[in-house]
Amino acid sequence: MRILVNISYQGSQFLGFQIQQQGRTVQQQFEKILKRMHRRHVRIHPSSRTDRGVHAYEQFFHFDTDLNIEPKQWKYAMNSALPDDIYVKEVQQVDDHFHCRYDCLGKRYRYKVYQATHRNPFESGLKTFIKEDLNYSKMNEAAKHFIGTHDFTGFCSQKTEVESKVRTLYQSEIIQTDEGFDYVVTGSGFLYNMVRVLVAFLIEVGKGKRHASEVSTLLNEKNRDSVPFTAPAEGLYLEKIYLTEKDLTTDFGDNIKIHRKKSLQND
């Protein structure tokens, strides 16, 4: 049977989600538990592979098992063995043809920034610190230009290996907070470092060093050298995974054009 698991984690002490040859990862923690329960290796398949230091309010993975265990018992068993910086929120049995990555229709990220005269040690690893004043209105104007279907070659890591760098963004906005701002972005999928590059560009806009009018040209240029900065990982949160059309239409309306993945090569 196939089991779907909904989790959250504080990513500061992880080298990312995906298992590494050395170092602590989220995948490693779960596969260690499943190996102990099954007495053999059990691979998990996530909806997203977050990078080092990135957090998740919501993340899904699935695995196959021949153990006859109720969902609530799976949840209890995992939470009993997990460290304090990971929590299993929900477990359910799904159809054997369901694939956590392939059937993912969208993701929402939130990037948190606080502004102050000096760095706050209690925000370390949780939010990104910026000392300068920012023009939120101009930042939001620029953020809106990213909504739609575009080739984001110029706004991702040059290490990105996927064939197509075309992604559809349903939401891209700056939300002012008491301490600074959040950048909230929802899309069909995201390229390596894409959200962090978008944030870095928007911060430059807020400082008056870049302009919203540049976005169209930069998207067409597809040149990462024109957008050289990447925001730190510490402020980034995977906030929501969209596994059904209903989830997307609930948030964005029935007229939304849903982008479907053609292969597992997409994020």
Swiss-Prot record:
Keyword vocabulary terms for this entry: Isomerase, tRNA processing
Annotated catalytic residues: D51 (nucleophile)
E.C. numbers: 5.4.99.12
Keyword rRNA processing among record annotations: no
GO MF annotation terms: RNA binding; tRNA pseudouridine(38-40) synthase activity
Sites where the protein binds substrate: Y109
Family annotation (SUPFAM superfamilies): Pseudouridine synthase (SSF55120)
InterPro entries: PsdUridine_synth_cat_dom_sf, PsdUridine_synth_TruA, PsdUridine_synth_TruA_a/b_dom, PsdUridine_synth_TruA_C, TruA/RsuA/RluB/E/F_N
Cross-referenced HAMAP family: TruA
Family, similarity comment: Belongs to the tRNA pseudouridine synthase TruA family.
Function: Formation of pseudouridine at positions 38, 39 and 40 in the anticodon stem and loop of transfer RNAs.
Protein name from the UniProt record: tRNA pseudouridine synthase A
UniProt source species: Staphylococcus haemolyticus (strain JCSC1435)
